[in-house]
Amino acid sequence: MSNTTDADAKHPQSNILVEETVVYDNVFTTPLDKAARFSFDEQVVACFPDMIRRSVPGYGQMLAMLPIFAKRHCQAGQVNAEGKRVSRVYDLGCSLGGATMALLNEKGGFGKEELQIKAVDISPAMTQKAEVLLQQNYPEHDIEVITADIRGFELEPCDMVILNLTLQFLPPADRTQVLQSIYNALNDGGILVLTEKTHTGDEQDDAWLVERYYDFKRANGYSELEISGKRNALENVLITDTLDQHHQRLAEVGFNRSLTWFQFLNFASMVAFK
């Protein structure tokens, strides 16, 4: 699910680097074939920072908390190729590296050699641009950008995994296996931060939350055509779970406990502890 970068400009809410020249999201300004489905292609990648800023309520606040969590749970439990102790972190479904950049932001307080970050995404368009942005902004940090499907991707031992707005794009039948692989890779004391669009299971509550979400998008400049176009394109592509389903699944794969630490309309972020 993840804001991106360029040199010196900062987003006022998230305090992470963003592109100086904003490419506005106009993907759905013209009617699309009803059979068209949303994908993270070059057109989406080009406007992704604007798209996620205007489409995901609370996104900047969620990113800003990642280094705070990392400071508490990254224990330098791994050894890098140079024999130095580091904390390995995975950013799964990294998109343009927003979560990775949030961790490395100067306010996070991590030194250049304290974290080893592996950023993984299935979209070649995303990883190609993410690699450029991360290299431009954090050339001296230990970051590896990997193009891969996180299903079946082998994780090395790590202290923290970030799964932001990603699980929701996987078939429901594949989600437990992905979480199991994350749990197995985490060291004791490690955490998973899981952020997802959700639903409550109550028809009336969900209808209200969805309409307020569309109001949020209208307030951010999206037209009715854009809102309906993206809704249609995401049908059967983005499939939400309830918070209860998420927490039950986390318990099933072995996490000691999990909690919802942030919620804004129908978006929520959870942390699971090993």
Curated annotation (Swiss-Prot):
Superkingdom, natural source? Bacteria
Gene3D superfamilies xrefs: Vaccinia Virus protein VP39
Q: Name one GO molecular function term.
A: carboxyl- or carbamoyltransferase activity
UniProt keyword list = S-adenosyl-L-methionine, Transferase
Enzyme Commission code: 2.1.3.-
Q: What class of enzyme is it?
A: transferase
> InterPro entries recorded for this chain?
CmoA, Methyltransf_25, SAM-dependent_MTases_sf
- Give binding positions for S-adenosyl-L-methionine: Y59, G93, C94, S95, D149, I150, N164, R231
What this protein catalyses is: prephenate + S-adenosyl-L-methionine = carboxy-S-adenosyl-L-methionine + 3-phenylpyruvate + H2O
Please cite one Gene Ontology biological process associated with this protein: tRNA wobble uridine modification
* NCBIfam families referenced in this protein's UniProt entry, alphabetically: carboxy-S-adenosyl-L-methionine synthase CmoA
The protein's job, in short, is:
Catalyzes the conversion of S-adenosyl-L-methionine (SAM) to carboxy-S-adenosyl-L-methionine (Cx-SAM).
Family recorded in the similarity comment: Belongs to the class I-like SAM-binding methyltransferase superfamily. Cx-SAM synthase family.
HAMAP family under this entry?
Answer: Cx_SAM_synthase (MF_01589)
Q: How does it assemble?
A: Homodimer.
Per its record, how is this protein called by name?
A: Carboxy-S-adenosyl-L-methionine synthase
- Annotated source species: Psychrobacter sp. (strain PRwf-1)
